[in-house]
Amino acid sequence: MSEDQYMGNLYQRFPVTVEKGKGAHVWDIDGKEYIDCMGGYGVALVGHQNKRVNDAIKEQVDKIITVHSSLYNKTREEFLKTLIGLAPKGLTQVHLNNSGAEAVEAAIKFARKFTGKKGMVAMKGSYHGKSFGALSLTFNPKYKKAFAPLVEKVSFASYGDIESLKEAIDDDTAFVILEPIQGESGIIVAPDGFLQDVRKLCDEKGILLIFDEIQAGLGRTGRLWACDHWNTAPDILCLAKGIAGGVPMGATLVRPDILASMSKGEHSSTFGGNPISCAAGVAALKSITEDGLIENSEKMGKLFKEGLEKLKENHTMIREIRGKGLMIGVEMKFE
């Protein structure tokens, strides 16, 4: 466990040194097998050592490892076409980056530039990352207090409450950002009708709507996109985690008129669109959409919730079970 002397105290560490993985299982250096319930905090979406992803990475490594986006690359082109072919309606352009926080940072800049406005509205209970802009949109004070003051002109509305959102916006609001299912705050599912109401309100006020599907997207909820449960599309969509099968990647999907407002050089990423990440991304997206992972998430999620509900009948400490697909949370009570 000598990593600690080099990495400081930034992470909650567990006394397991992982050596290898396969599917939903990992093995430590002593050969002990574990079921990986962590999954890299949502990254191992297609499982460890997914054959499609492994083969794609090996093939790409033998061609070229890095190509900056100032040059063209066929692997990147294939990934972009694949991703846009699956994107919510109207989102036909992409900025490729390296993480969820970077995807959110790009969304902030794009929305502010396009609207010419500065105000930002996020939700109470939100989590969007720990870089400065994303942290400003994250609700939990424990992540923010030590770094104040953060980005100004951020307001928070109560999740699921359209009247609270109406009070939070003003004439200088550039965008509203929300997770269709809040992850870090406890798997809080948007009430039916809420996303549609937010979409209507944003359209009426000329405000952009950003969905953060970094955790909820890519089939986890039994739909490719969590927002599909409510037939509502955003103006900007933030993705990361399992998008490249475990290789670092983030993506900010956007309407073309929004991205057209940006001038060359106003935003970029040195490693965004890396060919290895893109090769892995094509493979991961094909695995999600062609190997039955979305359907499996819906089917197994129903079975899992049914089993949890039976447990709840006999265990009063279980307060509530909520979620969609295999994105499930169990709230406990200890009174």
Feature map (PLM): residue ranges:
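Conserved N-terminal phosphate-binding loop of PLP-dependent enzymes in the Aspartate aminotransferase
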Residues: M1-E335
